[in-house]
């Protein structure tokens, strides 16, 4: 993997870059649609490729391990071939999903014992087998196995958890060195900064992660319930420590406003279920604010869903029609809304990149944040 910073914004810490893997170039800043179980909910791969057009999508190690399982994925020749996606894929390590199973998991030095949310069967994740699972899944970018702390979090617990994450990281690195690539292309490895919302822990973790000299670095344990200002404070602190010549990935973030503000702090990569999940509930993101398409005010609005939108659904269908689909509980409504929201997120990060390259990102960001904060 090769990463190049092409341009830095003169008035913020934003940067435009390019990350090159064996499956192509990822232009940053980038938003990665979440394809948890080898599909982005409600979207065909053809629509994803031709209309939404992301350079990279995200898959989930926990879910793919449980279903379809590594045996099927290996037989298929890896996740790319299994799902018919020729561009880049990043897999998370399953740490966050295990964290979210708080009542059905036990964390020890060796790893995490957990019960499947599907059938209650018992499983164990260790740094070693998570590296093996991710080798078999075959994503272009794979993540270290970490523990994600909840919010709020006791300082002593956050400290113990951070040190555990660091010890697990050492085991990930040692084991990964023994595992050859499986499908004729290389994989890049990102460790994860933890430390909850404690400045000294975040600093310590960022310094430790930077010392590993991996191909990229991730920031985890944010967007788990903390106030947005705390998230920004932690992200800025960590970005200032992580090396400039490596991509920085803020995991699980966020709203369009969150994304723009974190780009200004030096973050390059984002993922979040928000555009797809909110779409299925009738919430549309636009450059002028958010729309609850189920509201009666859209019943007679025959204007396009979004005249500025980049996907075919934005101009082919009206707000009134989309509202009708939601009121009638037609699944097509959720699909249209999902394509719109993902298209908007990709438009947002692409335009941010253009503005960084043009040197006027900050003014544009301030204006966009004000506009997007409105309810239409």
What is the meaning of each model-derived region?
Residues 1-182, 296-299:
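Non-catalytic, usually N-terminal nucleic-acid engagement modules in DNA/RNA processing proteins
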Residues 70-76, 279-293, 346-349, 358:
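C-terminal helical cap(s) of enzyme catalytic domains, especially alpha/beta-barrels
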Residues 175-183, 246, 352-364:
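Surface-exposed helix-capping loop/turn segments at secondary-structure junctions
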Residues 175, 179, 187-305:
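Glycine-rich phosphate/ribose-binding loops and adjacent secondary-structure elements
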Residues 151-155, 159, 216-223, 331-334:
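Glycine- and acidic
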């Amino acid at each position: 993997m090769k990463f190049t910073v092409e341009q830095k914004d003169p008035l913020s810490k934003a940067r435009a870059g390019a990350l090159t893997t064996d499956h192509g170039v990822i232009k940053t800043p980038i938003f990665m649609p979440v394809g948890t179980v080898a599909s982005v909910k409600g979207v065909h791969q053809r629509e994803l490729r031709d209309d939404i057009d992301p350079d990279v999508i995200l898959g989930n190690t926990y879910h793919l391990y449980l279903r379809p399982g590594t045996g099927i994925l290996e037989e298929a020749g890896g996740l790319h071939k299994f799902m018919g996606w020729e561009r880049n894929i990043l897999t998370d390590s399953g740490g966050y999903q295990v964290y979210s199973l708080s009542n059905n998991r036990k964390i020890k030095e060796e790893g995490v014992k957990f019960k499947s949310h599907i059938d209650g069967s018992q499983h164990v994740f260790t740094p070693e087998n998570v590296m093996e699972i991710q080798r078999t899944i075959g994503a272009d970018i794979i993540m270290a196995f970490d523990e994600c702390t909840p919010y709020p979090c006791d300082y002593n617990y956050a400290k113990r958890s951070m040190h555990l994450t660091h010890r697990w990281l050492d085991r990930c690195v040692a084991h990964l060195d023994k595992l050859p690539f499986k499908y004729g292309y290389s994989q890049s490895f990102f460790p994860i900064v933890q430390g909850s919302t404690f400045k000294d822990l975040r600093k310590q973790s960022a310094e430790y992660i930077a010392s590993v000299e991996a191909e990229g670095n991730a920031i985890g344990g944010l967007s788990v319930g903390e106030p947005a200002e705390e998230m920004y404070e932690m992200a800025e602190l960590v970005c200032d420590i992580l090396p400039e010549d490596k991509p920085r990935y803020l995991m699980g973030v966020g709203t369009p406003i969150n994304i723009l503000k974190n780009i200004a702090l030096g973050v390059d990569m984002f993922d979040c279920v928000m555009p797809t999940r909110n779409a299925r509930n009738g919430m549309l993101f636009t450059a002028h604010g958010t729309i609850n398409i189920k509201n009666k005010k859209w019943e007679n609005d025959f204007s396009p869903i979004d005249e500025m939108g980049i996907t075919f659904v934005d101009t082919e269908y009206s707000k009134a029609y989309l509202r009708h689909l939601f009121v009638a509980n037609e699944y097509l409504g959720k699909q249209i809304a999902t394509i719109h929201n993902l298209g908007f997120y990709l438009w947002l990060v692409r335009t941010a990149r253009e503005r960084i390259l043009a040197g006027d990102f900050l003014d544009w960001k301030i204006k966009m944040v004000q506009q997007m904060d409105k309810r239409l």
